[in-house]
């Protein structure tokens, strides 16, 4: 079964985004956002080609988690690597 692996940049972006949401909107928003991310990751384990192909040569896929947030990932050797999580605004 595939595993989810976060690179350092994506992990920091996720943490920074959680911190921003906490400061601006409160704990409930952070909980909702975090839940949405991990629900998506569970779905991604079952359907790794769920996102749209953003970079064909590097086989990088993207998925809009929320109108303001996109996650970029790549499947490689049975693992799914989270490459970036960023604000679309």
State each model region's role.
Residues 33, 41:
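Extended, folded domain segments that form the structural surfaces/walls around functional sites
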């Amino acid at each position: 079964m595939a595993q989810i692996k976060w690179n350092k940049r994506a992990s920091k972006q996720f943490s920074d985004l959680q911190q921003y949401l906490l400061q601006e909107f409160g704990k409930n928003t952070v909980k909702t956002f975090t839940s949405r991310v991990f629900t998506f990751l569970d779905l991604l384990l079952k359907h790794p080609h769920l996102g749209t192909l953003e970079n064909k040569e590097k086989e990088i896929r993207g998925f809009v988690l929320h109108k303001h947030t996109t996650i970029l990932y790549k499947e490689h050797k049975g693992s799914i690597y989270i490459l970036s999580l960023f604000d679309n605004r």
